[in-house]
A protein has these predicted regions:
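Short, polar/acidic, helix-capping and beta-turn segments at strand->helix junctions
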Residues: 1-126
Length: 126
């Protein structure tokens, strides 16, 4: 099976030169995804809203790949302020509470100071 590239239409993908996701066989690798609404290229100041939008963006990429959040096997969370991570848990549990992928949280700077969380996932089509 040929490698397939998935785009969200984000200007970041075009400007930087990457794909929102790459499908290789049954594996789907979703790039680090932030809380921007790609239709308007706007981002909320609210951490929970950003977290929710991240996961909506990821779900859209997975659906383009013929998959869903239920197929996520690994997730990495990146927050500039690691102390804020517990605030995200209710939103994360809403999406991953039954899926329970392997997970890691990293505290590191992000590309834009408006970004408060970035999420990267790997999924295996079932």
């Amino acid at each position: 099976m040929a490698r397939r590239l998935i785009s969200s239409g984000s200007t970041f993908e075009r400007d930087i030169g990457y794909s929102r996701a790459v499908v290789d066989g049954d594996w789907i690798f979703v790039s680090g995804t932030t809380g921007f609404d790609y239709a308007t290229m706007t981002i909320s100041d609210n951490l929970l809203d950003q977290t929710d939008q991240c996961l909506k963006n990821i779900d859209a990429a997975l659906r383009q790949a013929g998959s869903s959040l239920r197929d996520v096997v690994r997730v990495t969370y990146v927050l500039p302020n690691g102390d804020e991570f517990p605030k995200c848990w209710p939103v994360l549990k809403k999406y991953f509470g039954e899926v329970r992928p392997a997970a890691m949280m990293i505290s590191a700077g992000l590309a834009d100071p408006k970004m408060r969380i970035e999420i990267e996932v790997t999924a295996l089509k079932q």
